[in-house]
Amino acid sequence: MANPLRGPCVRATRPHARRAEQGLPMKTLAKLPVTIVTGFLGAGKTTLLRHMLDNAEGRRIAVIVNEFGELGIDGEILKQCSIGCSEEEAQGRVFELANGCLCCTVQEEFFPVMRELVARRGDLDQILIETSGLALPKPLVQAFQWPEIRNACTVDAVITVVDSPAVAAGTFAAHPEQVDQQRRQDPNLDHESPLHELFEDQLASADLVILNKADQLDAEALARVRAEIAGELPAAVKIVEASRGELPLPVLLGLNAEAELHIDGRPTHHDHEGHEDHDHDEFDSFHVDLPEVEEAALLEALGELVERHDILRIKGFAAIPGKPMRLLVQGVGKRFDRHFDRKWLADEARSTRLVVIGQELDQAAIANQLRTALA
């Protein structure tokens, strides 16, 4: 299997000259703070990280992205800072760990990256880690107890991003209709759902919970979501509301939680499993390449697609005729968000590429349906 690491990469905001270059004595290096961002598929983790990078204010940040799927869409998004960023700066800031789950590949994938970043910690102020929406955060936090990491890094906080409208509708799971049917038949079955357990485990590991997409709910619905989430959390865990992950960096960084010291005392559903036997739901992922497409036609075609197939997540980029900017498309279930994220580069082919994630997918049928609808 080819090594999925694409590095070495560090965010290229470096306004502070190195002390050695100034002829100043070297200070003893403090522990490097690490923020772990977790949350279910489509909650808005990548959007949050992009907001943090765009507002870094000189902080030298390295990013590790753990994606599910063969196409590094999240890594590509994070390599683009605010519109107008130079192409040179846009490269070399992100490590991508693809086709895996950090909770299962800590030693073979995550550890080599951390070893490299530890060696370079004098050039860094912060590490951000975005986990896959299918990952368990607790084993990742526990990895920071290892001697080679714990002496150099500390987990400043685990931030869990929650899709507020999905929770309000009871549709954070991949198959809301099935969940509702199970809930009607036996309320206890929902709590034994692997997806529900994953959601609860992500909350159990949190030092800060973000109720994202809060602008899409009225005050009453948002209050219900807050109460539901608060019922899953220790009283000390703070809950904040956000729209598109837009929060001041002092809210997100500098929490000093030292989560690696306390994570063992946070019970989760998977504590008594041998992690080598940890079983994820079987998900398929593949990408579909298309030419330029009309925005309205694309959204209609994607809506029809999720009606006919067991699709959990669609994410990618689209080229819209006559538009100089690339359209970022992200969908969970029947809900699709889109916005223009940056201009097409001069040497970049204007094309559409979508990643589809789901269960028992007929890849040929899905690709043919899309191409026929958009022909």
UniProtKB/Swiss-Prot annotation:
Residues 177-192 have a biased composition (Basic and acidic residues). Residues 173-192 are annotated as: Disordered. GO terms for cellular component: cytoplasm. A motif (CXCC motif) lies at residues 101-104. Residues 283-374 form the CobW C-terminal domain. InterPro entries: CobW, CobW-likC_sf, CobW-like_C, CobW/HypB/UreG_nucleotide-bd, P-loop_NTPase, Zinc-reg_GTPase_activator. The keyword Chaperone applies. GO terms for molecular function: ATP binding; hydrolase activity. Its EC number is 3.6.5.-. Pathway: Cofactor biosynthesis; adenosylcobalamin biosynthesis. This is Zinc chaperone CobW. It comes from Pseudomonas aeruginosa (strain ATCC 15692 / DSM 22644 / CIP 104116 / JCM 14847 / LMG 12228 / 1C / PRS 101 / PAO1). The gene is cobW.
